């Protein structure tokens, strides 16, 4: 059974789809896509369930969401293994993803009250009350790189606010989505409150274009996000939250502990095989002996990164990319940069045919006058040597994206200078730029988003404010307005 609609599992009426373990090419899931008719049934189920779900009240909704957290705790080993099998990420990393899913419950409950709670104040005109109400029926489109944590970051706050959800996961990670929804079912979520439709582009289009959804929350590529933005033009009544990619810069300046700096570079560029939207894509290192020493250490460290299957022992740092197609795409990206004048310092290679296993790459692109402003979504880091700090910041800002950026520097003054000038929604100092806090907003500017930050601020796009002026009874004012008599 592939789809979960109105509290029941259904076989799809579309074409066959499979999910492949990218580390060995084995099929680990198969099903049939949802047709437009099945998507419509899911939307109707969500619509029918929405008002009753809202009227349960926050405390009752929270109790069910906390029951889901208990299910995550009880099934965390199975969920972590499923994520590892389907994405190719090593088990140590998928265990941290499940931990983030569990932690999201308390953070989302806190965010609900802080960002969208109820506030009342007595004023001369009456009691002024600010409340928040759910949008209604929302679609959640999940990505493949964090198939549990990232859609979870939309679904949990949406449900807490009183919305109902149609979840359309990446077609590359359907098994993770199926397990997540089974845990929601075990938690006692009422029928129709969450619905799962699996499929590819046609399924996604049917859901995104459905006239009865009130909002769409998307995490994925900038290209798809821009298409959704165009589609929603002229529909101001629908809320659209886009969390997209980045061509993220990391600048190194005056760091004495170059070993620590190299560690932060590795964690920024190569974790998750470079498949995080916040991964460093461009590295700016000072010209001179100190920069030379750092690069020499970095080259050696990149060459020593362990790559292997998700379940290899001892565990690798990098697992497989999501697919062989993705791996070949990174080889092609490297070749393109070489054609433009780049110089390989560590070659990215496709390690095994039929898999997504690649080695990490490092390429010096200083000689390229105009770098392609592309998000190469994999373990390929572009190095640029710079002369002065202003030049580095100027180059770092030469991107249409604006998701994450970072500075490794011993000087607080340098960081303050950088912070004032860099254009990004996540700006870190002396920390990996893939590091983000669930207690803070997560999002970018430019081609990285549409000013709908997620994580702690996800509550903002899950509800709308309702302002009221209230009194317990109708009463005449002490003085009537001019021209009135009663």
Swiss-Prot record:
<keyword id="KW-0560">Oxidoreductase</keyword>
<dbReference type="InterPro" id="IPR016162">
    <property type="entry name" value="Ald_DH_N"/>
</dbReference>
<dbReference type="InterPro" id="IPR029510">
    <property type="entry name" value="Ald_DH_CS_GLU"/>
</dbReference>
<comment type="similarity">
    <text>Belongs to the aldehyde dehydrogenase family. AstD subfamily.</text>
</comment>
<dbReference type="InterPro" id="IPR016160">
    <property type="entry name" value="Ald_DH_CS_CYS"/>
</dbReference>
<feature type="active site">
    <location>
        <position position="277"/>
    </location>
</feature>
<comment type="pathway">
    <text>Amino-acid degradation; L-arginine degradation via AST pathway; L-glutamate and succinate from L-arginine: step 4/5.</text>
</comment>
<comment type="function">
    <text>Catalyzes the NAD-dependent reduction of succinylglutamate semialdehyde into succinylglutamate.</text>
</comment>
<feature type="active site">
    <location>
        <position position="243"/>
    </location>
</feature>
<feature type="binding site">
    <location>
        <begin position="220"/>
        <end position="225"/>
    </location>
    <ligand>
        <name>NAD(+)</name>
    </ligand>
</feature>
<protein>
    <recommendedName>
        <fullName>N-succinylglutamate 5-semialdehyde dehydrogenase</fullName>
        <ecNumber>1.2.1.71</ecNumber>
    </recommendedName>
</protein>
<keyword id="KW-0520">NAD</keyword>
<dbReference type="Pfam" id="PF00171">
    <property type="entry name" value="Aldedh"/>
</dbReference>
<dbReference type="InterPro" id="IPR015590">
    <property type="entry name" value="Aldehyde_DH_dom"/>
</dbReference>
<keyword id="KW-0056">Arginine metabolism</keyword>
<dbReference type="GO" id="GO:0019545">
    <property type="term" value="P:arginine catabolic process to succinate"/>
</dbReference>
<dbReference type="GO" id="GO:0019544">
    <property type="term" value="P:arginine catabolic process to glutamate"/>
</dbReference>
<dbReference type="InterPro" id="IPR017649">
    <property type="entry name" value="SuccinylGlu_semiald_DH_AstD"/>
</dbReference>
<dbReference type="InterPro" id="IPR016161">
    <property type="entry name" value="Ald_DH/histidinol_DH"/>
</dbReference>
<dbReference type="InterPro" id="IPR016163">
    <property type="entry name" value="Ald_DH_C"/>
</dbReference>
<dbReference type="GO" id="GO:0043824">
    <property type="term" value="F:succinylglutamate-semialdehyde dehydrogenase activity"/>
</dbReference>
